[in-house]
Amino acid sequence: MTELTADQDVVRRYLCDHAPGSRVVSARLTQTARALVTHQNMPPQVAALCQEMSLAASLLTNCLKFEGEMIVQAKSDGPVSLLVAECTSDGQLRTTAQWDPALSATGFRDLVGTGYFAVTVDPTQGERYQGIVTLDADSIAACMNQYFHQSEQLDTEMWLAADGHSAGGLLVQRLATE
């Protein structure tokens, strides 16, 4: 077994013995979370949003069995007008944002304003799929949950947290039964 250090990014998948028909994916992004802050010179509130978007893309990518790319995007009229996280099936992750340099807002709703939230699955082979929901929830996790409830066939919930130094998330999904 490999020993994990606090600086590593870790994504794990689980099937639950005590909850048959459920799948859990957990993620901790420490190295990636710090790189976003260090290399992109973002304000802390934008970095936290990017870290959560990175988590969402990582969790989704590791929940599906496919080869290709998962893209999670928020486009809005707020001071943070664009958030995009792309995660490939081989674990490559890229996240970017566009924000107003005079940014002073701190709450999610004040940062993003109104717009749309999109999840795109772009498989290497097969058809591209995109689901879009309005950007009217109170967090990235809530936007993801709104997407799951409107666009997906499986009951799924996601929780995300980021503090600028590390980020963690959990996705719980009820699998289809026959």
What are the language-model segments listed below?
Residues 2-178:
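Interaction interfaces in information-processing and related assembly proteins
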